[in-house]
Amino acid sequence: DRSPSRGLGDVYKRQVYIIETKHEKDTNALETVRTLFANKTRDFITAVDEKSIILVKEVKGNESYDELDKTADVIIDMLSTEAMSAAHVAYGTIVNDIREVSRSYKEAKMALDVGKIFYSNKNVVAYNRLGIGRLIYQLPIPLCQMFIKEIFEGKAPDDFDDETLSTINKFFENSLNVSETSRQLYIHRNTLVYRLDKLQKSTGLDLRVFDDAITFKIALMVVKYMKYMESKDTF
């Protein structure tokens, strides 16, 4: 019976990674991770459920979060090549005390969830870099519903057609730059202006105005969060 606290002295900094594999009961993945850290006697690795592996890793005094990112990248690369397994890795903050390891684990778990909702294109998600996604994740659902109702007066942002949504997302990606957005969408500048005007008429929000853009961006994230929570409740 190996528990995370056994054999882990109190003088080392640590931090928790959660590695979630695409397939359930992926024994190859667990073995690959164990092999990767085989010579690290102070690191602890275990499978917690069908798809998740936990790595409690010793952190050297001078190791930065950038280096922890690199470790996560190495894990993903190894799983991809050695175990033929796609994975997501999330990690918590560095803790100074063995009693705080559970906090780093909870942070990693939250990072995994927040990553699925808002940053699905990222394979590595760090708790301390979750940004606004972490804030939204901690909002009560009734508050989210009220916010969406107030902003859109009954018309949810995901009711927009694909063309409108891709225009909005591209506009945000390009920091509200009309010329660059129209170039990347292969449309005339006037076409983009027309779409933004149309959106303004239907929502009352002008995405060319910074405050309105922020409101809209947050609203889209809130809707993503609500949908994710809904899908969790249906299982």
Identify the function of each model-found stretch.
Residues D1-Y12:
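Single conserved hydrophobic/aromatic residue that forms the stacking wall/gate
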Residues D10-F235:
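Cytosolic nucleotide-utilizing catalytic cores of signal-transduction proteins
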